[in-house]
Structure formats: C-alpha cells, structure tokens
Amino acid sequence: MAAPWWRAALCECRRWRGFSTSAVLGRRTPPLGPMPNSDIDLSNLERLEKYRSFDRYRRRAEQEAQAPHWWRTYREYFGEKTDPKEKIDIGLPPPKVSRTQQLLERKQAIQELRANVEEERAARLRTASVPLDAVRAEWERTCGPYHKQRLAEYYGLYRDLFHGATFVPRVPLHVAYAVGEDDLMPVYCGNEVTPTEAAQAPEVTYEAEEGSLWTLLLTSLDGHLLEPDAEYLHWLLTNIPGNRVAEGQVTCPYLPPFPARGSGIHRLAFLLFKQDQPIDFSEDARPSPCYQLAQRTFRTFDFYKKHQETMTPAGLSFFQCRWDDSVTYIFHQLLDMREPVFEFVRPPPYHPKQKRFPHRQPLRYLDRYRDSHEPTYGIY
C-alpha cells in the first residue's frame, strides 16, 4: 500500500530541514538574528584563523562576551529579577578618589614587594605571614562597605528599617561585648550573639573627625510582642562628640536583648548617624531606668524621618540572637512580667478523599481516616 501524500511530503521536508522548515514544523518562529558560529564554514576548517596563544584567545573571548547579543544567557534568563523601582540612597556620598593616585600607589606597592628579598624568600619557602589586621583595614577602606550593604539587603534590614531605602555604611562601626574579664564577643554582620554575652552595654569604636557629632542606636527588629511592624529600642546615645561614645547623651538606657522563647532568631542592628549640628532629642528621651516595654516601642523609619534634615546614616553593624536562660531573668527581674513562651503549631496533615476500594494500598491506609488513634497494624 502506498504511503499517504502528506507522509511523503513530511519526509521530504525532514530531508532538507533547516531553521525555516523547523520553525514551520514545530510552529516556532525563526531566530531573531544570527546564531552563534553561523559565519564559520564547516566544510573547510583548515582555513580558519588560529589564535596561536592563550592571550589572543582570552581577549577575543572577552570581546565576544561583552558584545551585545539578541539572545539571553543562562544567568540572565534564570537570574534574580531586578527591582523596577530605584531605591533611594540616604547615606553619605562616596569619597572622591583619584584613579591615577590609586594606580600609582598600587604600582609602588608591587615594586616594593618585588624588591624585598626577604618577602620573596618567605613566600618561596611558604613561611610568609599575612598581617590580618592590615588586610581587614584595607577591606574596610575599599570594598567592605559594599559587602556590608549586600549583607544588610540579604537580611532585610533596609526593607524593615527604612522601608526599602538603602545606604552604604561608609564609616566602619566596631562593636564588641565584654565576656568575662579578658574575652570579647565582636559583632560583625549577622553573627550570632547570645543574650548572656550581650548582658552589658558593648564597647563601640569608629573613626570620626574632631568636632563632629554622632547618634548611635540599637534596635530589635523582630522582638515586639504586640505590633508586628514595630521595634524595641534597646539603646540610644545622641550628640556624641567625635568617637568618644562615653560622653554622649544617654537618651535611652541600655537594655539587654530578650528574644522570647520559641520565637526563633531575632535581628538586632546598631545604626550610626552623622549629625550636621546639635539636635534636641527631648521628644525621643526615655526615663532611666526604663523597664516598660510600651515606652521602648520604636520605629526607626519614623525616627529618621523626623531628623532626616540634620543627620545621615553612616555606619551599620548587626547580629542575631535567640533565647537562652538569661532571658527569663530579664522578664522576671527587670521587666517585672511573666515570660511569654511561643510554640509553633503545625497545620494538620492533608489527606485526600478516602477511596471506597483502595486498590494496592497497605492496611495502614485506613488509619488516616479513623477517629481513634488505635493503629490498625499489629491487631491481626
């Protein structure tokens, strides 16, 4: 029996299949532009130009990667969607740095390292030591503020503190809690600090010009017991002269973190603001001591909105905290209240509608739909 005419035509099309025929057969449109390597003559590969060195190949590959294409790459297709709304930058302006001066300093440092015979010998023998303090200082001076900004974005600090506005923490803020007599618990960007370690006010240091004024606050983003969008103010120092934190005005005394039991991990953030002039914070002052949680209810967005004309966020440091035994003491002795305890209640398990004849199902299948908790298995 002869094959139908449409099958013969389909076989003939498949024999000469190209982009246009594939588009017709698969109900797709042809590509919007030239495909990769479409300009290469595959019939005569010997006549293609050879790179003959890796540097020429790398330069050519970089040019091809940076050239505009009509298609999207894998990362562009599956990458994170960018926010169409531009975020407002409320921080300090970036410092003016001469690119020529940077290149000269870098070239001079390379020349000094090459001329240092001892360093070369130590590197060759693998006995060289790297000064970590100098590395950290260089990191904080160059790319560290942008890394901190990315971490704060990841933990949702800008979203919850400033309603989406962002800033680059230009001023390195160093916070450390004293643990015992000799040990310190530093605060970086998201490390975990227990309430026991944060029982006393920390030591805060930063670099500041003489004659400048600063404001330092510590707030808990996830600890409010009544209002989900409110915070608890743990510490507020205002009109700090220079970097002498101890001489600042104690607008709100320090209160240790008290994450409730069963409420998970809480975020606590230190914010450093640079003031343009002395500010009257009498409306934001709390009594000392202040152990009423209603008086410590706080919103960073409203606080900054009130004083945004005279101060600018400049530094940021934050940590995570969860419940331990010292929180019970804070609730009972300091706050003079019963300690709240939370428990995660899981939703009931979902079971599909019971089948009258559960074919190939075990006997335990009936336990899902019984009113009693007595198991079916083991009784026969």
UniProtKB/Swiss-Prot annotation:
Pfam families in the cross-refs: PBP (PF01161)
A biological-process GO annotation: mitochondrial translation
Gene3D superfamilies: PEBP-like
Keywords recorded for this protein, A-Z: Coiled coil, Mitochondrion, Ribonucleoprotein, Ribosomal protein, Transit peptide
Any coiled-coil regions, as ranges: 99-127
CDD domains in the record: PEBP_euk
GO cellular component: cytosol; mitochondrial inner membrane; mitochondrial large ribosomal subunit; mitochondrion
Transit peptide: 1-26
Source species, domain of life: Eukaryota
InterPro entries hit by this protein: PEBP (IPR008914), PEBP-like_sf (IPR036610), PEBP_euk (IPR035810)
Location in the cell: Mitochondrion
Ribosomal protein recorded as keyword: yes
Family the UniProt entry places it in: Belongs to the phosphatidylethanolamine-binding protein family. Mitochondrion-specific ribosomal protein mL38 subfamily.
Assembly, per entry: Component of the mitochondrial large ribosomal subunit (mt-LSU). Mature mammalian 55S mitochondrial ribosomes consist of a small (28S) and a large (39S) subunit. The 28S small subunit contains a 12S ribosomal RNA (12S mt-rRNA) and 30 different proteins. The 39S large subunit contains a 16S rRNA (16S mt-rRNA), a copy of mitochondrial valine transfer RNA (mt-tRNA(Val)), which plays an integral structural role, and 52 different proteins. mL38 is located at the central protuberance.
PANTHER family referenced in this protein's UniProt entry, alphabetically: LARGE RIBOSOMAL SUBUNIT PROTEIN ML38, PHOSPHATIDYLETHANOLAMINE-BINDING PROTEIN
Name of the protein described by the UniProt record: Large ribosomal subunit protein mL38
Organism: Homo sapiens
Name of the gene this protein is made from: MRPL38
